[in-house]
Protein backbone atom coordinates (compact mmCIF):
# COMPACT_ATOMS: atom_id res chain seq x y z
CA UNK A 1 0.00 0.00 0.00
CA UNK A 2 1.31 3.41 -0.94
CA UNK A 3 1.66 5.99 1.83
CA UNK A 4 -0.55 8.47 -0.05
CA UNK A 5 -3.44 5.97 0.11
CA UNK A 6 -3.43 5.87 3.92
CA UNK A 7 -5.23 9.19 4.38
CA UNK A 8 -8.35 7.68 2.79
CA UNK A 9 -8.56 4.58 4.97
CA UNK A 10 -11.68 4.47 7.14
CA UNK A 11 -11.30 3.06 10.65
CA UNK A 12 -14.06 0.47 10.22
CA UNK A 13 -16.82 -0.36 7.78
CA UNK A 14 -19.70 2.10 7.94
CA UNK A 15 -23.03 0.91 9.36
CA UNK A 16 -26.12 2.99 10.14
CA UNK A 17 -28.99 2.11 12.45
CA UNK A 18 -32.10 4.24 12.15
CA UNK A 19 -34.36 3.85 15.16
CA UNK A 20 -38.16 4.02 14.85
CA UNK A 21 -39.36 7.42 13.74
CA UNK A 22 -36.16 8.25 11.81
CA UNK A 23 -36.74 5.98 8.82
CA UNK A 24 -37.15 8.77 6.25
CA UNK A 25 -34.09 10.80 7.19
CA UNK A 26 -31.98 7.63 7.50
CA UNK A 27 -33.07 6.50 4.02
CA UNK A 28 -31.98 9.91 2.65
CA UNK A 29 -28.63 9.67 4.44
CA UNK A 30 -28.13 6.14 3.13
CA UNK A 31 -28.90 7.15 -0.50
CA UNK A 32 -26.46 10.04 -0.24
CA UNK A 33 -23.67 7.89 1.23
CA UNK A 34 -24.11 5.12 -1.36
CA UNK A 35 -23.94 7.67 -4.20
CA UNK A 36 -21.06 9.65 -2.68
CA UNK A 37 -18.90 6.62 -1.92
CA UNK A 38 -19.43 5.15 -5.41
CA UNK A 39 -18.37 8.53 -6.80
CA UNK A 40 -15.22 8.51 -4.64
CA UNK A 41 -14.31 5.05 -5.95
CA UNK A 42 -15.02 6.08 -9.55
CA UNK A 43 -12.67 9.07 -9.18
CA UNK A 44 -9.94 6.81 -7.74
CA UNK A 45 -9.76 8.68 -4.43
CA UNK A 46 -9.81 5.55 -2.28
CA UNK A 47 -7.17 2.84 -1.93
CA UNK A 48 -7.96 0.00 -4.39
CA UNK A 49 -7.23 -2.56 -1.68
CA UNK A 50 -10.31 -1.55 0.36
CA UNK A 51 -12.88 -0.78 -2.37
CA UNK A 52 -14.95 -3.88 -1.50
CA UNK A 53 -15.25 -2.85 2.15
CA UNK A 54 -15.74 0.83 1.31
CA UNK A 55 -18.78 0.53 -0.95
CA UNK A 56 -22.06 -1.22 -0.21
CA UNK A 57 -25.53 -1.20 -1.72
CA UNK A 58 -26.85 -0.06 1.65
CA UNK A 59 -25.27 0.99 4.93
CA UNK A 60 -28.51 0.55 6.88
CA UNK A 61 -28.80 -2.30 9.36
CA UNK A 62 -32.06 -3.94 10.34
CA UNK A 63 -32.79 -3.62 14.05
CA UNK A 64 -35.86 -4.27 16.16
CA UNK A 65 -36.98 -3.36 19.64
CA UNK A 66 -40.05 -5.53 20.13
CA UNK A 67 -42.26 -4.63 23.07
CA UNK A 68 -43.88 -6.98 25.51
CA UNK A 69 -47.41 -6.41 26.83
CA UNK A 70 -46.05 -4.61 29.89
CA UNK A 71 -44.18 -2.05 27.79
CA UNK A 72 -40.77 -3.63 28.38
CA UNK A 73 -38.66 -4.23 25.29
CA UNK A 74 -35.54 -5.92 24.00
CA UNK A 75 -33.05 -4.76 21.38
CA UNK A 76 -32.17 -6.98 18.44
CA UNK A 77 -29.62 -6.40 15.66
CA UNK A 78 -30.15 -8.87 12.81
CA UNK A 79 -26.67 -8.63 11.25
CA UNK A 80 -23.08 -8.51 12.40
CA UNK A 81 -21.58 -5.20 13.54
CA UNK A 82 -18.15 -6.62 14.35
CA UNK A 83 -15.48 -4.05 13.51
CA UNK A 84 -17.95 -1.52 12.07
CA UNK A 85 -18.14 2.21 12.65
CA UNK A 86 -21.71 2.16 13.90
CA UNK A 87 -23.90 5.27 13.72
CA UNK A 88 -27.22 5.11 15.56
CA UNK A 89 -29.75 7.81 14.70
CA UNK A 90 -32.66 8.40 17.08
CA UNK A 91 -35.13 11.29 17.39
CA UNK A 92 -36.14 11.34 21.04
CA UNK A 93 -38.91 13.91 20.52
CA UNK A 94 -41.01 12.13 17.88
CA UNK A 95 -44.33 11.56 19.64
CA UNK A 96 -45.84 10.09 16.46
CA UNK A 97 -44.37 6.65 17.21
CA UNK A 98 -46.51 4.45 19.44
CA UNK A 99 -46.47 0.99 20.97
CA UNK A 100 -49.02 -1.16 22.75
CA UNK A 101 -48.92 -1.42 26.53
CA UNK A 102 -51.66 -3.17 28.49
CA UNK A 103 -53.82 -3.19 25.35
CA UNK A 104 -53.59 0.56 24.68
CA UNK A 105 -51.60 2.61 22.17
CA UNK A 106 -49.00 4.69 24.02
CA UNK A 107 -46.77 7.36 22.40
CA UNK A 108 -43.05 6.86 22.90
CA UNK A 109 -41.56 9.32 25.38
CA UNK A 110 -37.99 10.63 25.22
CA UNK A 111 -37.12 8.11 27.94
CA UNK A 112 -38.54 5.24 25.83
CA UNK A 113 -36.33 6.27 22.90
CA UNK A 114 -33.29 6.56 25.15
CA UNK A 115 -33.95 3.12 26.66
CA UNK A 116 -34.26 1.63 23.15
CA UNK A 117 -30.97 3.30 22.22
CA UNK A 118 -29.30 1.68 25.24
CA UNK A 119 -30.86 -1.67 24.28
CA UNK A 120 -29.37 -1.49 20.78
CA UNK A 121 -25.94 -0.48 22.11
CA UNK A 122 -26.15 -3.42 24.51
CA UNK A 123 -27.21 -5.75 21.68
CA UNK A 124 -24.06 -4.73 19.80
CA UNK A 125 -22.19 -6.24 22.78
CA UNK A 126 -19.01 -4.22 22.32
CA UNK A 127 -18.34 -5.61 18.85
CA UNK A 128 -18.35 -2.39 16.77
CA UNK A 129 -15.06 -0.57 16.45
CA UNK A 130 -16.79 2.71 17.30
CA UNK A 131 -20.36 3.67 18.22
CA UNK A 132 -21.68 7.17 17.52
CA UNK A 133 -25.15 8.24 18.59
CA UNK A 134 -26.83 11.00 16.60
CA UNK A 135 -29.84 12.47 18.38
CA UNK A 136 -31.35 15.32 16.33
CA UNK A 137 -34.46 17.14 17.54
CA UNK A 138 -36.44 16.72 14.32
CA UNK A 139 -39.97 17.12 15.61
CA UNK A 140 -39.65 19.61 18.44
CA UNK A 141 -42.36 22.28 18.34
CA UNK A 142 -42.11 25.77 19.81
Question: What do these predicted regions represent?
Answer:
Residues 1-142:
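PRPP-associated nucleotide enzymes
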